[in-house]
Curated annotation (Swiss-Prot):
Domain of life: Bacteria
Protein name in UniProt: DNA-binding protein HU
Gene: hup
Species assigned in the record: Staphylococcus aureus (strain Mu50 / ATCC 700699)
SUPFAM superfamilies xrefs: IHF-like DNA-binding proteins
Gene3D superfamilies: IHF-like DNA-binding proteins
Amino acid sequence: MNKTDLINAVAEQADLTKKEAGSAVDAVFESIQNSLAKGEKVQLIGFGNFEVRERAARKGRNPQTGKEIDIPASKVPAFKAGKALKDAVK
């Protein structure tokens, strides 16, 4: 399922126009993104948690030259599925 499919599903299930559903989906994504950018955790009970995790600095290797390089520490978004979502997928 891609974003267009998601918008169509939301429009059908919530009895909205595709434009309204698109605005709702965009608002949800933007809210999650803004919260993560502030370092906040987003908890959606039954669905899962979005959070920012620290990735440690590490050594890597350039695949073209084989030369070792330093990869700096970074922050990455992460998602952990909730129990209801895990059970639905089983």
